[in-house]
């Protein structure tokens, strides 16, 4: 008998997602244990299986938290592999412009879009960014996210990018969610460099990336927005090759607005993920599959932009890609952070069934940030990151449009969300 400090019993279904990241037909296999149970000690899972088997192998004590799921579904905590949640200000006016027919590109050409958030974020202090970020992490937790990637990219100067990354690091230290930081100084060309783009690329390669690499814990990945009018394929290659040389994993915002070649570049460089992919060709998607680069679909962005297509997730699966889902939470093109809602959009607009969408939002999303050995599934040895739904099965997530489906959230074996309240400590 093994002593445990967490025991979850009474699951209507225990959705384990065991067996690693999924491709093809395996995405439909959620590895469900009817009437399953889970036990953990010191933040890690020590037993998972049918309830009677688990109860025979573990020992509870006076300090053991026993949670009765009462016939509801128990699933892995959601992993959001793509957010921009460290920012100041908002872009509600931009939303109104889109309702009036303005496109993302038209708003950006007027000096809005990303640059609007850059101005607000530059004006904010690091402490202000931390407090804003902590409040947003609370909202993610309330909606079942237990691991989240957070990008910089609203500073676009050495000092402001470092400020953003330090704010991300500080909020990670003060919040129970696992936060994976990504440097994205190549999110846009700042106004002061518009007439000398090459000088900004030089700054990224020669100063920003080395400075970020020199400070422990600031970033695990580097990302580039490879798009017409932002960074060309050649510029992106130069930035990402330098990032790789400095030890960063690399990611690419690829083929969101046009088929520029970002997805093919991601495959060429062995990027851990390529993201957006609305206009990626079959040839490029096949290259992603061959390279093992995770294809991260962000249906919330297409939904919020209204006039954008959706990524061809069904085709990605047919071509052998590892398909993941993320929120792309940001103040402009997707002010939505709830992964249950993203799962709903994936089922309605990307052609995924609920099991495929849940795999894409858990174990495959974990692979998109190099965390699949730690999170994304309920298996012995992994972090005890668990969501207890308010519904009897995971298929009810999109059925309820992602609303009100999260009852409790456990992070590293500790109950952090209960009855609509977040417990940071």
From Swiss-Prot:
InterPro entries: Amidohydro-rel (IPR006680), HutI (IPR005920), Metal-dep_hydrolase_composite (IPR011059), Metal_Hydrolase (IPR032466). Keywords: Cytoplasm, Histidine metabolism, Hydrolase, Iron, Metal-binding, Zinc. It catalyses: 4-imidazolone-5-propanoate + H2O = N-formimidoyl-L-glutamate. The keyword Metal-binding applies. One of its GO terms (biological process) is L-histidine catabolic process to glutamate and formamide. Binds 1 zinc or iron ion per subunit. SUPFAM superfamilies: Composite domain of metallo-dependent hydrolases, Metallo-dependent hydrolases. Pathway: Amino-acid degradation; L-histidine degradation into L-glutamate; N-formimidoyl-L-glutamate from L-histidine: step 3/3. It is found in: Cytoplasm. It is an enzyme of class 3 (hydrolase). Fe(3+) binds at residues 82, 84, 253, 328. Zn(2+) binds at residues 82, 84, 253, 328. Its EC number is 3.5.2.7. Its cofactor is Zn(2+); Fe(3+). GO terms for molecular function: imidazolonepropionase activity; iron ion binding; zinc ion binding. Its main location: cytoplasm. GO terms for cellular component: cytoplasm. N-formimidoyl-L-glutamate binds at residues 154, 330, 332. 4-imidazolone-5-propanoate binds at residues 91, 154, 187, 256, 333. Catalyzes the hydrolytic cleavage of the carbon-nitrogen bond in imidazolone-5-propanoate to yield N-formimidoyl-L-glutamate. It is the third step in the universal histidine degradation pathway. Belongs to the metallo-dependent hydrolases superfamily. HutI family. HAMAP family: HutI. This is Imidazolonepropionase. It comes from Symbiobacterium thermophilum (strain DSM 24528 / JCM 14929 / IAM 14863 / T). The gene is hutI.
